[in-house]
Amino acid sequence: MNLRRTIATLLAALMLLALTACGAGTTSPAQDANAPAEETAPSTTESSQFRVGMECAYAPSNWQESAATDTNVPVENVTGAYAEGYDVQIARILADQLGKELVIVKLSWDGLIDALNQGQIDAIIAGMMDTAERRESINFSDPYKETIYSMMVLAGSPYENATSIQDFSGAAVLGQQGTALDEVIDQIEGVEHLSPVGSVPDMISRLQQGTCDAIVINVENAQGY
């Protein structure tokens, strides 16, 4: 992929695990593996399960695979899909400590908190940053991970040799909806802050299409491209 990563200085952000009590309800049918993630999930029905919500689209934190391995976990609501990544391994450790079966549920980012509050999942492990607004509706654990945000541009971009975020003044910059990847853009003076998109793959696609000059992405995810 003809991308270049520049500037790992936007923001050092703590990535936290959200934990709340389990709920009850009905179960939804499985999705096709190629279908987009739904914003709802099967409700928690068995206390023997530890149900974790994530996007399964955010490597290396969490992503989706099509074949079982010794380390990935089946995605309950996507037929033939398996979740892998750092967040999945954290979830496995927690499930083992709790003595419960780990169940991974694929959800869109903006559906995670609602699913947690409705009792459809027991936890969000998806690189969600602790904010005052989110604390109004969910609880957070201690940090399990730290990350640094970066700017990603295409190779050959006029911004390729930028050394400061202020070098992106006048640039059209894109972030992910409902995340700090979008919120931090306003730190850049004179920036053209584009309407955010729903996922990191969507941001990458927009960058490749040339509809933005740069995207905000954390360093570890940028290294996957």
Task: Give the location of each predicted region.
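Alpha-to-beta junction loops
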Residues: 99-101, 117-126, 171-172, 208-221
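Short helix-initiation/N-cap motifs at beta->coil->alpha
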Residues: 86-88, 103-114, 160, 195-209
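Ligand-binding "clamshell"
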Residues: 120, 132-147, 190-192, 225
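Extracytoplasmic small-molecule ligand-binding "clamshell" domains
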Residues: 32, 44-128, 136
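Hydrophobic/proline-rich hinge and linker segments of small-molecule sensing/allosteric domains
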Residues: 51-59, 140-162
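Bacterial lipoprotein signal-peptidase II cleavage site
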Residues: 21-34
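Flexible hinge/capping segments at coil-to-helix
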Residues: 71-72, 154-172
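A ligand-binding cleft/hinge motif common to bilobed small-molecule-binding domains
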Residues: 110-111, 127-137, 184-187, 208-225
